[in-house]
Amino acid sequence: MSESEEISEFGYIMELLAKGKVTIKNIEKELICPACKELFTHPLILPCQHSVCHKCVKELLLSLDDSFNDVASDSSNQSSPRLRLTSPSMDKIDKINRPGWKRNSLTPRPTTFPCPGCEHDVDLGERGVSGLFRNFTLETIVERYRQAARAATAIMCDLCKPPPQESTKSCMDCSASYCNECFKIYHPWGTVKAQHEYVGPTTNFRPKVLMCPEHETERINMYCELCRRPVCHLCKLGGNHSNHRVTTMSSAYKTLKEKLSKDIDFLIGKESQVKSQISELNLLMKETECNGERAKEEALAHFEKLFEILEDRKSSVLKAIDASKKLRLDKFHTQMEEYQGLLENNGLVGYAQEVLKETDQSCFVQTAKQLHLRIQKATESLKSFRPAAQASFEDYVVNISKQTEVLGELSFFSSGIDIPEINEEQSKVYNNALIDWHHPEKDKADSYVLEYRKINRDEEMISWNEIEVHGTSKVVSNLESNSPYAFRVRAYRGSICSPCSRELILHTPPAPVFSFLFDEKCGYNTEHLLLNLKRDRVESRAGFNVLLAAERIQVGHYTSLDYIIGDVGVTKGKHFWACRVEPYSYLVKVGVASSDKLQEWLRSPRDAASPRYEQDSGHDSGSEDACFDSSQPFTLVTIGMKKFFIPKSPTSSNEPENRVLPMPTSIGIFLDCDKGKVSFYDMDHMKCLYERQVDCSHTMYPAFALMGSGGIQLEEAITAKYLEYEEDV
């Protein structure tokens, strides 16, 4: 439908509104699902307040899940099982090594997808589709529309014996339609069923009471003003809405109904104004057509002028090259003729040899003088051969780098719209890419277009992918592993756009991101380590207990390392994870360890203050991670005092200055179980700092150790957690 047709239809609807003659068919546009473009079927209300069919939401999540698995399978094996520890003791490590232990894939399911109605990313949270309300009001309106569309088709009784009679009413409690006789039979007078609520024949049955999706046995009886959604009393008492402002459902119903009625009355009362505005819009449309054609002609004229300049320069450059080529070829031809003459001097040489046979001195001198001059000239030519011209045209290469950059930024006059700037500190890449930018407040843009593309050295041109964004940040998903990507942003205000921002290059991790949390049951020392509730951050407390242990330390004994591991293990495939070590940390170790090695480290923990017990110090001077075995079942690197220590190696320099690097802001660990290799990365630049072989014949776990004061924070996955939606009326 064209714009003029839509405006005419809107004016027609307004006219019917004023006369109170709007029928159900005039609102069909509001009853179409933005995803499947068909009438709504069991519509669900998304967090952005738009409605989408239940099946469409599931299909969107399923398609995202398929693409997520496809990306993961490209960089790892088809099967990459992860083992979750369940036992509170060390027996769980023994258990996973026994034959027959079932390994389950715990690949996280995506819960974020773009709303088909507004294109905003919506996050369904942990409950997913189960946490969404069903839009019963919209469902009822759709059913009325369907009934109006099939008015000639009767709804038959569900309880009649064949052939069934036409139904006359539908019971909302029984969710069935009845003819008069069957309704009397199944709803006898004086019984509880006689009190059931019934309506006209319908196929749309909805519950009489709206239940809370988070607390399925509780009725909805309140309205959260902050989240703009109905809630139950449990949501208010101890749920996600405990600190939110809520009101009673009756009060919210009254307020919203008054607002809606008032707005409808306002629209109906503005019929004449709407008609005049429609006329104005028609004039503006005609003016837009004329101005658009004029702007198009002006743009073509500007480009024709550029083409003329390029053609003129092209002609001049080609003429200069042709002239230089002709001059050089002439010189080469002249020189070639000279050397061709040298070949003809073979006769001269023979003639000179015959002259040498002359015995009469007077005759010889008379002839040899001129002959010697000719021979001498030929000899000099052979001694100093130099081409008469250069064959290379390097001086005639056209430099178009600056012109290419200028032409690439060729755009409309921006009317003062500044170029947005990408915030490099806030932008990052992990499981997804988060791109953040800012724009001067005085040049507030209506929207932005984020462009990105993979940088492929083998291909000259790769097209840019575009995403329209209404905020100043965006999460970009489905990026290929181990690939550099370029990002840039353009601002739009009305129909004017700014030039593109400076490009930001981010390199994706070498493998899919591996999700896990710290294990609070296996080897976790509650006396020295403090784990937060989310189990993604651990701190080491160098307090009174450590001082007491140090007081009794004997010769050959060192303060122990406190180990903590991830709650998920892997047996095959490629995996990547990252963590941040706090700058104040004294000594921290990060890496991987096999289940067998963990048993050795964590089984039968002894008193750190015992003078008989000697434990590995964890230092490079004699630590196990500094051993020179070609392949061992663990690898840990040492980090502390704002330094990153590369472990000792027999193949490289072990001088301290060559092994000590500045501590990165975030450290990435890449485990390739198939190749038996672990690598450590600087996440800021996605640069490999150290790698070595590791024995992956057993289940491998992320392993960490702390000594003294320190802290480790697991890198949080990038998701569309904090979303902003436009305020609805």
UniProtKB/Swiss-Prot annotation:
**Region ranges (Disordered):** 606-626
Q: Which residues form the B30.2/SPRY domain?
A: 509-723
Residues given in the record as Zn(2+) binding sites: 212, 215, 235, 241
Localization per Swiss-Prot or TrEMBL: Cytoplasm; Cytoplasmic vesicle, Secretory vesicle, Acrosome; Cytoplasm, Cytoskeleton
Q: Which GO terms describe its biological process?
A: acrosome reaction; microtubule bundle formation; mitotic cytokinesis; regulation of cell cycle; regulation of microtubule cytoskeleton organization; spindle organization
Q: Does the keyword Coiled coil apply?
A: yes
Q: Where are the zinc fingers (RING-type)?
A: 33-84
Q: Which residues form a coiled coil?
A: 271-302
Q: Where is the Fibronectin type-III domain?
A: 416-511
Q: Which InterPro entries match?
A: B30.2/SPRY, B30.2/SPRY_sf, ConA-like_dom_sf, COS_domain, E3_ligase_FN3/SPRY, FN3_dom, FN3_sf, Ig-like_fold
Recorded hits in SMART domains, A to Z, give: BBOX, RING
Q: What class of enzyme is it?
A: transferase
CDD domains, A to Z = Bbox1_TRIM36_C-I, Bbox2_TRIM36_C-I, FN3, RING-HC_TRIM36_C-I, SPRY_PRY_TRIM36
For this record, the Gene Ontology CC terms, alphabetical, are: acrosomal vesicle; cytosol; microtubule cytoskeleton; plasma membrane
Q: Where are the zinc fingers (B box-type)?
A: 154-192, 207-249
Q: Which reaction does it catalyse?
A: S-ubiquitinyl-[E2 ubiquitin-conjugating enzyme]-L-cysteine + [acceptor protein]-L-lysine = [E2 ubiquitin-conjugating enzyme]-L-cysteine + N(6)-ubiquitinyl-[acceptor protein]-L-lysine
Q: Which GO terms describe its molecular function?
A: alpha-tubulin binding; ubiquitin-protein transferase activity; zinc ion binding
Q: Which Gene3D superfamilies match?
A: 1.20.5.170, 2.60.120.920, 4.10.830.40, Classic Zinc Finger (3.30.160.60), Immunoglobulins (2.60.40.10), Zinc/RING finger domain, C3HC4 (zinc finger) (3.30.40.10)
Task: Name where it mostly resides.
Answer: cytoplasm
What keywords were assigned to this record?
Coiled coil, Cytoplasm, Cytoplasmic vesicle, Cytoskeleton, Metal-binding, Repeat, Transferase, Ubl conjugation pathway, Zinc, Zinc-finger
> What EC designation does it have?
2.3.2.27
* Tissue/organ expression: Expressed in testis. Strongly expressed in the neural tube region in 14.5 dpc embryos.
Output compositional bias ranges, type Basic and acidic residues: 613-622
Task: State whether it acts alone or in a complex, and with which partners, per the record.
Answer: Interacts with CENPH.
Q: Which family does it belong to?
A: Belongs to the TRIM/RBCC family.
Could you identify this protein by its name?
E3 ubiquitin-protein ligase Trim36
Q: Which organism is it from?
A: Mus musculus
